[in-house]
A protein has these predicted regions:
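Phosphate/ATP-binding catalytic cores across multiple sugar-kinase/actin-like superfamilies
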Residues: 53-60, 219, 285-308, 354, ...
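Beta-strand segments within the central parallel beta-sheet cores of soluble alpha/beta enzyme folds
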Residues: 73-74, 139-141, 182-190, 211-214, ...
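Glycine-rich phosphate-binding/hydrolytic loop that grips phosphoryl groups
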Residues: 218-225, 274-275, 287, 318-319, ...
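A short glycine/serine-rich beta->alpha loop
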Residues: 108-115, 134-136, 207-211, 264-271, ...
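Glycine-rich phosphate-binding loops at beta-strand->alpha-helix junctions
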Residues: 17, 189-197, 307-330
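Gly/Ser/Thr-rich active-site cleft segment
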Residues: 13-15, 110-217
């Protein structure tokens, strides 16, 4: 078997389905599939993720002309900030309206740095809504890290880049909010080797004993998979919700824009978010996309930055040919070309890229 048949099994945990793909070293997607969850709104939906993975392994098809792939590793990403207890009890990222930390004049300065944390409000919400489970669980995981733990027994939290700490938490701020510091697994870096699949999981899934590589947030996997990691690149991640993401070399903050670090040191990502995009009427949806692009374009002009002429799209909406054509035609009127990258599910490509990078630079489980 040729070395080119070596693959990473990339896994992305979505809101309603699990996606899987076989990704080669050069980023080629040999095959991919999607497995819907039987009850995506069930409070214990996370318990079904490993069963969806098993179904994906059985379902994923390899073209007859190709040799059987040699799976070298699994790479896992998923939606966030979904939270899961060890029992599988799940607080999904989109269940409740976005909430902010309650800060006042008595709040210590170190906590104020976390005013825009993505995870802390959800952790506090979990504690308040499901207090018994919060107390009983040894660990509280982000979504993809729960599956990593199931597969390897290793409890981790993926911190995409050191500057992301204020979007997550640190020991001091957890203590300040009365959250046991040991309940949130320790941070590991993007591409961390969580260790091999356990023997039981190898047998259950029908997979070889290979390492599980931590990718973490699907947001990060999507940016990597679309190449939105260089200044002046932009992508449109459009599934059940939508985010237009612009990579820049300046930290720019503005109303209506979420500013987060890029995984590339020194760069930043500006996001305009459209919650529940897929459920909006098409005309309303497209006008929100146009407004988001115009906002980012204005910020670029105000800060002396060139705005790109091409946007790479990914996600479920990219698979709807009629909608994609309508959106592309509208953006052409703005002088912008809308394209699809290697595949419509760029998160899988990003997972593969992270895993292959980790395999080229081996690191023992930490």
């Amino acid at each position: 078997m040729s070395e080119s048949r070596d693959c990473v099994l990339a896994i992305d945990i979505g809101t309603t389905a699990l996606k899987a793909g076989l990704i080669t070293k050069n980023g080629e997607v040999i095959s991919m599939c999607s497995v819907p969850y039987s009850a995506p709104e069930n409070r214990f939906v996370a318990e079904g993720w490993i069963w969806a993975l098993k179904a994906a392994v059985e379902k994923i098809a390899v073209p007859e002309a190709l040799e059987a792939p040699h799976i070298k590793a699994l790479a896992i990403s998923g939606n966030g900030p979904t939270l899961v207890s060890e029992s599988g009890l799940t607080l999904r990222w989109n269940e409740y309206p976005a909430c902010a930390l309650s800060l006042d004049e008595t709040t210590p300065d170190e906590a104020r740095e976390f005013a825009h944390s993505i995870f802390l409000p959800r952790i506090l919400l979990f504690r308040d809504l499901i207090s018994d489970e919060f107390e009983q669980t040894t660990h509280l995981f982000s979504g993809p890290e729960y599956l990593m733990w199931q597969l390897t027994g290793k409890a981790v939290t993926v911190l995409p880049e050191p500057r992301y700490e204020t979007a997550y938490w640190n020991r001091e701020v957890l203590e300040g909010f009365g959250i046991p510091t040991g309940k949130l697994p320790d941070f590991v870096e993007l591409g961390h080797n969580c260790g091999d699949l356990t023997d039981n999981n190898c047998e259950f899934l029908g997979l070889p004993k290979v390492p599980v590589i931590a990718v973490g947030p699907d947001f990060i996997a999507g940016l990597i998979g679309t190449g939105t990691t260089k200044a002046g690149t932009i992508c449109d991640r459009a599934g059940s919700s939508e985010g237009i993401n612009f990579c820049v070399d300046k930290e720019i903050r503005a109303e209506g824009v979420r500013t987060l670090p890029c995984v590339t040191a020194g760069l930043w990502n500006l996001s305009v978010l459209i919650p529940n995009s897929a459920s909006l009427p098409e005309d309303q949806r497209i006008e929100k996309v146009v407004a988001g692009i115009e906002l980012l374009k204005t910020l670029a002009e105000q800060n002396g930055l060139a705005f790109p002429k091409q946007i790479t799209t990914t996600g479920g909406q990219a698979k709807d040919e009629a909608w994609f054509g309508k959106k592309r035609a509208r953006l052409e009127q703005m002088g912008i070309e809308l394209v699809v990258g290697t595949c419509e599910d760029a998160e899988l490509v990003g997972d593969g890229a992270v895993a292959w990078s980790a395999l080229r630079e081996p690191q023992g489980p930490q």
